[in-house]
Amino acid sequence: MRILLTNDDGIHAEGLASLERVARTLSDDVWVVAPEQDQSGYAHSLSISEPLRLRKIGEKHFAVRGTPTDCVIMGVKKILPGAPDVILSGINSGANIADDVTYSGTVAGAMEGALLGIRSIALSQGYSYVGEDRIVPYETTEALAPALLKKLVATPLPDGVLLNVNFPNCLPEEVVGTVVTMQGKLVHSLWVDERRDGRGLPYYWLRFGREPVEGKQGTDLHALRNRLVSVTPLQLDLTAHEIRDQLSKALA
């Protein structure tokens, strides 16, 4: 089984090294094609206004000056000797759940894989802060992902479906179990932080100010809050099928 790894945190991210260790429990044919720099929040963007630069880091390890989507395309269409059987994207530093999946470069890496007809799974690990230090228990994903991925890789999926897996912010022995979930709903809390440069000109940072949300039972939010691993099937078809008839009647 050939496995392609990517992420959005960059080629040198701790989570990517952790994912490679996980992948090597499944296969000896593991390839890494990841962004040269942090691409968090770039979602499913493509680099079409500037060229991509490719750098070989080591055996089967490549850095692309581009987005996670660029990396998957380069891996599948340029770098690997043949199409991978599985694409794994992650392990992201922080959960990718609810509305945040639309911003996520980690999820987008798996999304591009699904577009290419390849079994694709995004993996993310919740974290917490101790003072100003971000503590990401990657050991939780490393301990639990191998057995879970064996099951997920062996499970048939319809075309156009990818899997979004999130691990709770706790130690492996504190995880209660694994559940299949749906996307939850966060309170939109992005805000604009205006500052001034040395010449007095304004510049801006977009910042998260998350409000605590428990989430309804059955959602990814609720699962992580209750120390459960969340597995959410996502689909490429974004059509809101349930209101098509209603719209047709309104336009008749």
Swiss-Prot record:
Protein location: Cytoplasm
Positions that bind a divalent metal cation: 8-9, 40, 92
UniProt-listed Enzyme Commission number(s): 3.1.3.5
InterPro entries registered for this protein in UniProt: SurE, SurE-like_Pase/nucleotidase, SurE-like_sf
Listed GO MF terms: 3'-nucleotidase activity; 5'-nucleotidase activity; exopolyphosphatase activity; metal ion binding; nucleotide binding
Record's keyword terms, sorted: Cytoplasm, Hydrolase, Metal-binding, Nucleotide-binding
Function: Nucleotidase that shows phosphatase activity on nucleoside 5'-monophosphates.
Family designation: Belongs to the SurE nucleotidase family.
Record protein name field: 5'-nucleotidase SurE
Species for this entry: Mesorhizobium japonicum (strain LMG 29417 / CECT 9101 / MAFF 303099) (Mesorhizobium loti (strain MAFF 303099))
Lineage: Bacteria, Pseudomonadati, Pseudomonadota, Alphaproteobacteria, Hyphomicrobiales
